[in-house]
Amino acid sequence: MQIFVKTLTGKTITLEVESSDTIDNVKAKIQDKEGIPPDQQRLIFAGKQLEDGRTLADYNIQKESTLHLVLRLRGGTMIKVKTLTGKEIEIDIEPTDTIDRIKERVEEKEGIPPVQQRLIYAGKQLADDKTAKDYNIEGGSVLHLVLALRGGFGLL
């Protein structure tokens, strides 16, 4: 099937894809056509950033759908959030993002509602209304995710 990818310059690229293709595959096809490395590509559909390991079918992207390509500038900051199971989630943030926004990004990737998340960095629990910059969170920083169970006391 054909899909379209629209760049910020307004250029539209046509790609031949299968619904079983992963977002990684799509980024590789964009690289073949446009020479943009996949790690600099962010694909958006229906207002959501598409995750590399997922397929077009996962996002209900059908023939003649239009994806939007945004370039990740070097200034975008990649951090990791480590869960209690040891799983590491990579998240692309801006220094001005609030902790609440980072929790929303965790929810997008893992399905955990922000109200159940406690993020810890440098031994401190992070307040929702503060920014990454307030806590000196920068590229490569690792935050720890602890789940807050309803009704119980969260003892760390």
UniProtKB/Swiss-Prot annotation:
Q: Give the gene name.
A: RUB1
Q: Which GO terms describe its molecular function?
A: mRNA binding
Found in which tissues? Expressed in leaves, stems and flowers.
- Using the record, list the residue span of the signal peptide; answer none if the entry has no such feature: none
Q: Which residues form the Ubiquitin-like domain?
A: 1-76, 77-152
Q: Name one GO biological process term.
A: protein neddylation
Q: Which InterPro entries match?
A: Nedd8-like (IPR038738), Ubiquitin-like_dom (IPR000626), Ubiquitin-like_domsf (IPR029071), Ubiquitin_CS (IPR019954), Ubiquitin_dom (IPR019956), Ubiquitin_ubiquitin-like (IPR050158)
Question: Family, per the entry?
Answer: Belongs to the ubiquitin family.
What name does UniProt use for this protein? Ubiquitin-NEDD8-like protein RUB1
One cellular component term (GO) for this entry is: plasma membrane
